[in-house]
Amino acid sequence: MEKKECPEKSSSSEEELPRRDSGSSRNIDASKLIRLQGSRKLLVDNSIRELQYTKTGIFFQAEACVTNDTVYRELPCVSETLCDISHFFQEDDETEAEPLLFRAVPECQLSGGDIPSVSEEQESSEGQDSGDICSEENQIVSSYASKVCFEIEEDYKNRQFLGPEGNVDVELIDKSTNRYSVWFPTAGWYLWSATGLGFLVRDEVTVTIAFGSWSQHLALDLQHHEQWLVGGPLFDVTAEPEEAVAEIHLPHFISLQAGEVDVSWFLVAHFKNEGMVLEHPARVEPFYAVLESPSFSLMGILLRIASGTRLSIPITSNTLIYYHPHPEDIKFHLYLVPSDALLTKAIDDEEDRFHGVRLQTSPPMEPLNFGSSYIVSNSANLKVMPKELKLSYRSPGEIQHFSKFYAGQMKEPIQLEITEKRHGTLVWDTEVKPVDLQLVAASAPPPFSGAAFVKENHRQLQARMGDLKGVLDDLQDNEVLTENEKELVEQEKTRQSKNEALLSMVEKKGDLALDVLFRSISERDPYLVSYLRQQNL
């Protein structure tokens, strides 16, 4: 067994390694043991505390244990050992590492039962299987992915994977956590074009997917330093059976075409109980990074740029324009954001809440520099607030920066431009014509109104609403009903008479009161609301 010195000193206290199956545990100083298996380097350590790099608190390697002569590992394709990647954090590196600890406190250590055993014969077999699939699918994946990534659906509600035998439906299984499930019936490559997430599978498998926020797991001031950069969405992925998944393709918005980005900077961040574990992807393609024989966790692409490197990172980006109709003064919102389908969907949803309508525009043709400032201007000399937008990444769900301007009744076309602040280079322009707004307004469905729904379905609600106790409490809490009005409804003798008394009382209070009533009914009897909405289609 080859030995190699690591920069970390081993703990002076020896702990008994966890017992696995019937194997006997041995007390060893395992911090210096490295076992080479093919191209993989497995660091064996008897304490996960040894694997936390003291300067950053980040775990670069999963815990492993030794029983008899067998090495067990947790991650089948783990990141390089601490020795191999410690050059990212040299002792004279003065970058602000301390705020980047991500609370990676090693209190939740893995037990031996959490670490699957893999014999050398099994590894050889798995490698052969993976190689066969990759050799058959790789050419298809590479050529097709480059095409499909330019055609990613902007509609995130497109809940289908494109597979080798056609489309595969994605099922929403938990709306509160935004969690989805999909069953891949056969081996092959599958792509969810609405998100850019892809899988290469060996056999049929069920995959569950949820979407996370970087800001909930690490401090986003990372991206304001030149050393770190969020490179794509965050996905929480599980699979059953796990071994059926040969590759995961994680989307990123980093531009590789200019040759300014070193693919060795790409890391996959896994968020686990013990902290953040970093893994190098097997390869990096123009629109996604590949994990082979992956472990499953909350994961996403993170760039670690070598210390002292001074350059701007080019990324693919989107310009999103929304207009808010008004008879006297039409308002526009303009966003400049990284090309992230999940981020676009979040902005769409937020704008839709305020009846904003997105205009169809093309993105910037060339990559833009992350962290650079850009100036928004227009041909009509309309006041833009703010004029300057900084191209940065904010997780979906956070407040996104945008520029706003008013165009009156807009009887003439408006030319919009975005220029790079430092050099004055034009990076994007478009023309918005009055007819564009008319076409969008004609094709867009009218905004949904809870008040209108209650009015249109008065008779159905009067006949079908059930127990009103919770609804009455909601209306009183929101100051729609007084205590006396609530008692008047409750004094009615029959269910339908109570319903009629409530509906009539709230309708007299206006649309805002009806909106509150609709929200309450939707939360307490969603099936009734869903049924009535279907009847109205």
UniProtKB/Swiss-Prot annotation:
Effect upon mutating G57A: Does not affect cleavage by HIV-1 protease
Q: Where is this region: UPA?
A: 297-446
- Indicate the impact reported for R459E: Abolished formation of inflammasome filaments. Abolished ability to induce pyroptosis
Q: Name one GO cellular component term.
A: nucleus
Outcome reported for the amino acid change (mutating K55A): Does not affect cleavage by HIV-1 protease
Q: Where is this site: (Microbial infection) Cleavage?
A: F59, F60
Know the name of this protein?
Caspase recruitment domain-containing protein 8
Task: Record the organism.
Answer: Homo sapiens (Human)
